[in-house]
Amino acid sequence: MRDYDEVIAFLGDWGPFQRLIFFLLSASIIPNGFNGMSVVFLAGTPEHRCLVPHTVNLSSAWRNHSIPLETKDGRQVPQSCRRYRLATIANFSALGLEPGLDVDLEQLEQESCLDGWEYSKDVFLSTIVTEWNLVCEDDWKTPLTTSLFFVGVLCGSFVSGQLSDRFGRKKVLFATMAVQTGFSFVQIFSTNWEMFTVLFAIVGMGQISNYVVAFILGTEILSKSVRILFSTLGVCTFFAIGYMVLPLFAYFIRDWRMLLLALTLPGLFCVPLWWFIPESPRWLISQRRFEEAEQIIQKAAKMNGIMAPAVIFDPLELQELNSLKQQKVFILDLFKTRNIATITVMSVMLWMLTSVGYFALSLNVPNLHGDVYLNCFLSGLIEVPAYFTAWLLLRTLPRRYIIAGVLFWGGGVLLLVQVVPEDYNFVSIGLVMLGKFGVTSAFSMLYVFTAELYPTLVRNMAVGITSMASRVGSIIAPYFVYLGAYNRLLPYILMGSLTVLIGIITLFFPESFGVTLPENLEQMQKVRGFRCGKKSTVSMDREENPKVLITAF
């Protein structure tokens, strides 16, 4: 009995049909790149200080000294959330007293920004922060905005697979594109922060659903050899292209509503893709819609210039194939033995902390020295060589060492940021980008590594659980950025330390390179450096002489 890949092998691997599907599905990911990171500019916090109304009768000297100073990054700057009590300094101004000469400013009573704030417009003309004053006592709302977007991403990752299984890959792909584009457009008309945030969470649901379904559709249509290229370089590289486009839009459009409109419009260009992207033949077969699946393959063969067999799918053969029942599995199977539980816990930590590093570095771009638009572009650009490097390393080297190696690289250079003199800002930016390179490379390898560690029976569940852990990491990441308001170096110290720590933990994983994928839980390799309880002589013999074939990658 042949499987699906054997049935359609006559199509070849890289004909016009496969190239069309590869590039169209990859291109559909571009809006995900700029929508996913748009919060960097939509919720940017410009320099600000308390507003001193023009109606207050102050001399020019007292107006210039109405804001207390504080030391920040080694220089004196006006405080962002405090001012001298206006009634007091107005009296001093009326008496003709001079600040700093007749009055000791350090002894003056201070008050909060009772009349609002004035914001610098050097970088942003308007953001949701300036529109709804998400600063000082309300500055906690800014990271929460981003976290709730990723909560939407987490929810979307739950439902996207189930929806595509029920209604089909193609319909759900375009429906979730519509959700992402439509609700992004509705966000433009937000009247308050609460409305914006709820809509942003829905956009997050649409964004990840679009990504996941495009990923599934590509892996089901493309052949095995192209499937790896699509999942590692295709979708990831086009996501990075969208990421790089974002700062170009933001540079020329500095009003958040107009920027959001500009980022929404490209989603309309995905509409014509409906007539070029087919439904997944695999899904159609699973729904017993054999004729529709055969029509798609016939069109693909015609596009590739290949003569297709008269009958491609034998209903009896496929019915027999679909009738095979898999053993039911439960989440507790990932913790069935001490060894499996250890691998699962370490995998969850690896995914979550790597995700924290990736998203914290991406979202922390506004806090870097220099031009925020250039830094954001570089942050997206550095991902392209990171993905290519990961792809090349996965082809030739053991998984544990390459993942640990790039994590050590990323964490190490992030820890070096704290020793760079303040005058060498370009060095700090370079180190941060090198750190992003390492973390991004590691992140892109995790799907392959996790899939190779677990047996077929629980592989999808394991990847799903660890992927959920990465969503939790993305929810936490904005608060690492938030710590930068207290100390500019603190996020890098924490991210660098955690990245090095998870790199060390990676060395305790079993190696999966060149090893046949396990088919059941008993074939899973043992964690290195851990004792998994007492073993019988028989079980010890099995571990010393495992029945696992070593194959070339």
Swiss-Prot record:
Q: What is the tissue specificity? A: Expressed in intestine, liver and kidney. Weakly expressed in brain, thymus, lung, spleen, heart and skin. In brain, it is expressed in cerebellum, especially in the granular layer, in hippocampus and cortex. In kidney, it is expressed in cortex and medulla with relatively more abundance in the cortical-medullary junction. In heart, it is expressed in myocardium and valves. Expressed labyrinthine zone of the placenta. Expressed in Sertoli cells in testis.
- For the Extracellular compartment, the record's topological domain ranges are 42-142, 193-197, 254-257, 361-373, 422-428, 484-488
Q: One MF term from GO for this chain?
A: amino-acid betaine transmembrane transporter activity
Identify its membrane topology class.
Multi-pass membrane protein
Q: Which residues cross the membrane?
A: 21-41, 143-163, 172-192, 198-218, 233-253, 258-278, 340-360, 374-394, 401-421, 429-449, 463-483, 489-509
Q: Which PROSITE patterns match?
A: MFS, SUGAR_TRANSPORT_1
Q: Which UniProt keywords apply?
A: ATP-binding, Cell membrane, Glycoprotein, Ion transport, Membrane, Mitochondrion, Nucleotide-binding, Sodium, Sodium transport, Symport, Transmembrane, Transmembrane helix, Transport
Q: Note how its activity is modulated.
A: Allosterically activated by intracellular ATP.
Compartments annotated for it: namely:
Apical cell membrane; Basal cell membrane; Mitochondrion membrane
Among the Pfam families in the record, one is: Sugar_tr
Glycosylated residues are 57, 64, 91
Residues recorded as binding ATP, renumbered to this chain, are: 218-225
The record's InterPro entries line, in alphabetical order, gives: MFS_dom, MFS_sugar_transport-like, MFS_trans_sf, Orgcat_transp/SVOP, S22A4/5, Sugar_transporter_CS
Q: Which residues lie on this side of the membrane: Cytoplasmic?
A: 1-20, 164-171, 219-232, 279-339, 395-400, 450-462, 510-553
- Binding partners and assembly: Interacts with PDZK1.
* Role description: Transporter that mediates the transport of endogenous and microbial zwitterions and organic cations. Functions as a Na(+)-dependent and pH-dependent high affinity microbial symporter of potent food-derived antioxidant ergothioeine. Transports one sodium ion with one ergothioeine molecule. Involved in the absorption of ergothioneine from the luminal/apical side of the small intestine and renal tubular cells, and into non-parenchymal liver cells, thereby contributing to maintain steady-state ergothioneine level in the body.
Q: Which family does this protein fall into?
A: Belongs to the major facilitator (TC 2.A.1) superfamily. Organic cation transporter (TC 2.A.1.19) family.
Q: What is this protein called?
A: Solute carrier family 22 member 4
Which species expresses this protein natively? Rattus norvegicus
Q: Which gene encodes it?
A: Slc22a4
